[in-house]
């Protein structure tokens, strides 16, 4: 848990984030790139899924995760709610606010980024989380929606729909105090600086924190 009014942010692989305050634990996007121990977590107050793609929700292992956290609020976009057949999921939408413990979760946006025009855009609802006076934004798979007042931005760094210039522009538009990378297991170690260094050099964030797949940081 975080202490002294800080928020603890832990990466758990690719797009999965565990956000903790003294009172509340929120897990976001437990997908196929996560190790098995992520799906054995307990004591969660909320489980959030931004969209249906398997790198954001591993349906097979997610069943055990939800069963291990029977009191957790489970939030997801409307299309994912129609697809999952385990647990009780609450639909998250753009602008909808949900309070869990000392955390307020607000839905941001509605559609996934375009991968190729021939593919339909699935639903995608990012989350702006207010905790301990800090606002944390995780957009899911899109750069389209830019909320105001973001302290910490978890920026998707690499995917079939991303482009480095658009990543940099998105960070510039959000203008966070701190930026950290997520959605990056599609990038090789050798190529990683080609993406992350551009965010550092050109994104304009106050601070850039490079977290490994199992690393944590604390934000006052």
Spans of model-derived segments:
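Core dinuclear metal-dependent hydrolase active-site scaffold
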Residues: 1-42, 89-149, 161-166, 212-220
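Hydrophobic/aromatic beta-strand patches that form the interior of the parallel beta-sheet core
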Residues: 10, 46-48, 75, 90, ...
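Binuclear metal-ion centers of metallo-dependent hydrolases, dominated by the metallo-beta-lactamase
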Residues: 10, 85-99, 168, 178-220
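A short helix->loop->beta-strand "cap" motif at the edges of active sites that frequently abuts
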Residues: 24, 68-73, 174-178, 204-206
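Active-site metal-binding motif and surrounding structural segment of the metallo-beta-lactamase
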Residues: 32-76, 151-154, 175
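Catalytic metal-binding/acid-base residues of hydrolase active sites
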Residues: 53, 80, 111, 143, ...
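Short internal beta-strands
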Residues: 71-79, 178-185
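A short, conserved beta-to-alpha structural element at the edge of catalytic cores
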Residues: 82-84, 162-175
């Amino acid at each position: 848990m975080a202490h002294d009014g800080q928020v603890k942010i832990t990466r758990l692989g690719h797009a999965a984030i565990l956000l903790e305050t003294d009172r509340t634990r929120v897990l976001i996007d437990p997908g196929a790139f996560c190790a098995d121990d992520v799906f054995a977590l307990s004591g969660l107050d909320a489980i959030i899924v931004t969209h249906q793609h398997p790198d954001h929700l591993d349906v097979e292992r997610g069943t055990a995760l939800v069963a291990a956290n029977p009191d957790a609020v489970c939030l997801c976009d409307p299309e994912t709610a129609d697809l999952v057949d385990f647990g009780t999921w609450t639909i998250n939408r753009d602008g909808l606010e949900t309070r869990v413990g000392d955390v307020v979760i607000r839905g941001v946006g509605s559609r996934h980024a375009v991968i190729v025009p021939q593919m339909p855009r699935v639903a995608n609802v990012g989350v702006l989380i207010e905790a301990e006076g800090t606002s944390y934004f995780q957009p899911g798979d899109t750069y389209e929606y830019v909320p105001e007042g973001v302290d910490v931005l978890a920026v998707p760094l690499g995917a079939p729909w991303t482009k480095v210039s658009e990543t940099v522009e998105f960070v510039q538009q959000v203008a966070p105090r701190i930026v950290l990378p997520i959605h990056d297991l599609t990038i090789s170690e050798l190529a990683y600086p080609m993406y992350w260094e551009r965010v550092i050099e050109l994104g304009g964030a106050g601070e850039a924190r490079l977290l490994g797949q199992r690393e944590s940081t604390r934000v006052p």
